[in-house]
Amino acid sequence: MIEFVYPHTQLVAGVDEVGRGPLVGAVVTAAVILDPARPIAGLNDSKKLSEKRRLALYEEIKEKALSWSLGRAEPHEIDELNILHATMLAMQRAVAGLHIAPEYVLIDGNRCPKLPMPAMAVVKGDSRVPEISAASILAKVTRDAEMAALDIVFPQYGFAQHKGYPTAFHLEKLAEHGATEHHRRSFGPVKRALGLAS
C-alpha cells in the first residue's frame, strides 16, 4: 500500500461513511480530528476489526480526539436525492458539526462533497489515513447500534445480523412482510417488495 503523504497543515479531519449499500436506515458519516499528542494505537478500517476492538476504539477515539462529529442522511433524503448525493450531504453535516474547524479534510473514496475548506478524496483512505480510520469506526459502531435498535422493533427482518444489507434472508423477509417506514423506497428490492405487498 502506498504511504499517504499529508498536506502541510495542522488540523486535518478525516471523514468516512457507513451504510451506502443497505436497503434500510440512514447513511451515517463521521468526521474526526485526532490529537497528535494523544495517539491511538490500532486504528484500521472498521470492517477489518473485530466488533469488540471497534467498540473499544470507539470509546478511545471519542475521548482522545480533538474534535469528532457524526452526520447522517435519513431514508427519505436518500430517496429524494439518491444515495450518492445523500452521502455527500451527510459528510457535509459531519464536518459542519466539528467544534474545531479543520484546515483540511480527507475523505475516504474518490469523491469530495463541497466544503468551506480544502479537501481531498483518498482511495482506500480508511486503511491509509488514521483520521479516516477513526471516522470509519465511529460511523460503523453508530450505525450498527441503530440497526440493533431497529431489530428490537422489527425482529422479523434480522437487522441486527445483516445491518440492512440485501442478504438472501433480508430479501426473503422483505417479500414476506413488505417494507418498514425505515426502508429506502428508491432501492430496487424495496420497490419490488412494495409492489408485492400492495
Swiss-Prot record:
BP terms from Gene Ontology: DNA replication, removal of RNA primer; mismatch repair; ribonucleotide excision repair
Cofactor(s) the record lists: Mn(2+); Mg(2+)
One Pfam family, short name: RNase_HII
GO CC annotations, alphabetized: cytoplasm; ribonuclease H2 complex
GO molecular function per UniProt: manganese ion binding; RNA binding; RNA-DNA hybrid ribonuclease activity
Keyword Nucleotide-binding: no
Signal sequence region: none
EC identifiers of the protein: 3.1.26.4
Keyword Manganese attributed: yes
CDD domains linked: RNase_HII_bacteria_HII_like
Protein residues bound to a divalent metal cation: 16-17, 108
Domain of life: Bacteria
Protein's cellular compartments: Cytoplasm
Keywords: Cytoplasm, Endonuclease, Hydrolase, Manganese, Metal-binding, Nuclease
Residues of the RNase H type-2 domain: 10-198
Catalyzed reactions per annotation: Endonucleolytic cleavage to 5'-phosphomonoester
Class of the enzyme per the UniProt entry, highest EC level: hydrolase
Cofactor binding comment, as recorded: Manganese or magnesium. Binds 1 divalent metal ion per monomer in the absence of substrate. May bind a second metal ion after substrate binding.
Main location: cytoplasm
Family: Belongs to the RNase HII family.
Protein purpose: Endonuclease that specifically degrades the RNA of RNA-DNA hybrids.
Protein's name according to its UniProt entry: Ribonuclease HII
Organism encoding this protein: Escherichia coli (strain K12)
